[in-house]
Structure formats: structure tokens, C-alpha cells
Regions:
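Mid-domain Rossmann-like dinucleotide-binding core that forms the NAD(H)/NADP(H) cofactor-binding site
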Residues: 57-143
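Structural detector of well-ordered beta-strand residues that form the stable sheet scaffold
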Residues: 53, 91, 115, 186-188, ...
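Cofactor-binding loop segments of dinucleotide-utilizing enzymes, especially the Rossmann-like FAD-
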Residues: 95, 118-119, 192, 216, ...
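Glycine-rich cofactor phosphate-binding loops and adjacent beta1-alpha1 units
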Residues: 81-86, 108, 123-127, 131-210
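Rossmann-fold dehydrogenase core element
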Residues: 186-188, 199-238
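Glycine-rich phosphate/adenylate-binding loop and adjacent beta-alpha elements
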Residues: 3-4, 8-53
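C-terminal hydrophobic helical "lid"/dimerization subdomain
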Residues: 143-144, 151, 155, 171-178, ...
């Protein structure tokens, strides 16, 4: 028992519960596991005895507080995992709530060049990316994205590539690899695709690429995200676009994928 508690203390109380093999996550833990209340679409939530809690800053609206997860991911992935900082050049693939949060995190960290890509369905979201601090936006359906990246970087490529797409398969990995600078870039990848036939391992090795996995965030990232959301430094209302009542959960989920103008949806439990 002492050994078990030592492991839990080191991983959870040490702020990085992502590495805990027995960790529970709302929205991911099966409802078959007692007490079966591992979702958040309700007026009340069940908190186990060792739940990790964060205090929402006074005055922060529920809608903006709801952006804390993508914002914490932005801080974790871009800053802590991939080392984005002063004078970094960054490629962000995907202008959804996650990609836009990455724009804010990178801008706040001092990145000198932020490039955001999207498809023809993302015209409005790419406009929002510009308003939040992106220097270059690329519609991959209308332009050659690699040529645009090389143009923006003077042929050097970017220091960091962040994959914030959904359902794009291996394309963001291949494009990110091509867009990275000649040597020593860092690439964040998603884990949607279980296998990757003909993975370009030689290219990864030759370019001395560091690969990081997008896997949630730690305690510190969440705390910093809440501070960022409460700072009023960015027009975050551009991300928190829509509100739905609890009875309209299905419509809310469908809305996110149906319209370019819907970015982050808030479910109001008492509405």
C-alpha cells in the first residue's frame, strides 16, 4: 500500500497525472465503472475523493472558463512540450478551438511568426486566427501550403509544427515534417491513426526531428490557462461563440461540426 501511494503522489500530486496508469478522466472513463457518473453534461458532477480541482478566477464567465481545456492544451503542447518561446516560428494546423488556443499561447510566449492552416470550410475561423495574433493564414484548398510556409519563412521552414486537426489522418504529420526547418525542428502529433504505413522514418532522422505526442495537460498548464482567460488580453469572445441549454446537447455537438462560425459551444446546465 505504501508503494502504491508513493506512485500516485509522485504522478498526481506532482502535477502530471497524465502518466498515472490508473487515472480517471471525465468524458473518457466508461460508465460501466462504479459509480457510473463520469460525464459532465449535468447540473451536478460526481467528484471522487482524490479529484483534481482548480479555482476559477473571480469574474471569469462560465463561457470563457469552459475554454480552459483547449487553452491548457495550448500551453502544454506549444510551450512545455515543444518549447515555443521568444522568436519561435510556428505552424498550427487546424483553426478550431484547439488551434486558436495555440495561437494565443504562442503569441503570449513571444513567437515571432505564427502560421495557421485550414480548409475551405474554415474561412471564418482563419479570420479569427488573424485577429488573435496569427501572422499568416493559409487555405490549403486554395493555396499551396508548403510554398506559402517557405515564402513566409524565407525558405527556412518553421521551428515547430502543431497538429490541431481532427480526422485528417496522416496528412498533418507529412505536411508538418516537410514544413519544419532543415535540422532540429519539433513536431506535435495527434494519435487518431493507429497505424502509419510507410512512415518516413529516414526523413525524421535526417532532419533531426523531435516528435511529441498531444496528450492532455498537466496541473500547471491548467492554472496558467485560467490566468490567461482572466487576463482580458485577447478577444476570447471570438472563440466562445454559442450557448445551448442542457436539453440541447445533441444539437450543440452537431453545431460544432456543421458550421464554420461555431467554434466553442457552452452548455448551460440550468438553462
Amino acid at each position: 500500500m505504501g508503494s502504491e501511494m508513493c506512485i500516485r503522489d509522485r504522478l498526481c500530486m506532482g502535477t502530471d497525472w497524465r502518466k498515472n496508469p490508473d487515472g480517471l478522466r471525465y468524458g473518457y472513463t466508461s460508465a460501466s465503472r462504479a459509480p457510473h457518473l463520469w460525464g459532465g453534461f449535468a447540473e451536478y458532477m460526481y467528484l471522487p475523493w482524490k479529484a483534481v480541482l482548480h479555482k476559477v478566477p473571480t469574474g471569469l464567465s462560465p463561457e470563457l472558463a469552459g475554454i480552459v481545456t483547449p487553452m491548457a492544451n495550448g500551453i502544454q503542447w506549444a510551450l512545455f512540450d515543444c518549447g515555443v518561446g521568444y522568436n519561435s516560428s510556428v505552424l498550427i494546423q487546424g483553426p478550431g478551438q484547439q488551434g486558436l488556443s495555440q495561437v494565443i499561447a504562442c503569441k503570449q510566449a513571444g513567437a515571432s511568426l505564427i502560421i495557421v492552416t485550414g480548409t475551405g470550410k474554415d474561412v471564418y475561423r482563419l479570420e479569427v486566427a488573424k485577429k488573435l495574433g496569427a501572422d499568416v493564414v493559409i487555405n490549403v484548398d486554395a493555396e499551396d501550403p508548403l510554398a506559402k510556409v517557405r515564402e513566409a519563412t524565407g525558405g527556412l521552414g518553421v521551428d515547430v509544427s502543431l497538429d490541431c486537426t481532427a480526422g485528417a489522418g496522416t496528412i498533418p504529420v507529412l505536411f508538418g515534417l516537410e514544413a519544419l526547418r532543415r535540422k532540429g525542428g519539433t513536431m506535435l502529433i495527434q494519435g487518431e491513426t493507429a497505424t502509419f504505413p510507410n512512415f518516413p522514418l529516414a526523413q525524421v532522422a535526417n532532419k533531426y526531428v523531435t516528435i511529441k505526442a498531444a496528450r492532455g495537460h498537466n496541473y500547471q498548464s491548467c492554472e496558467l490557462a485560467l490566468q490567461q482567460l482572466a487576463s482580458d488580453r485577447f478577444a476570447l469572445d471570438l472563440i466562445a461563440t454559442h450557448r445551448f441549454g442542457l436539453k440541447d446537447v445533441d444539437a450543440a455537438i452537431k453545431a460544432v461540426g456543421a458550421s464554420d462560425g461555431v467554434i466553442h459551444v457552452s452548455l448551460m446546465p440550468w438553462q
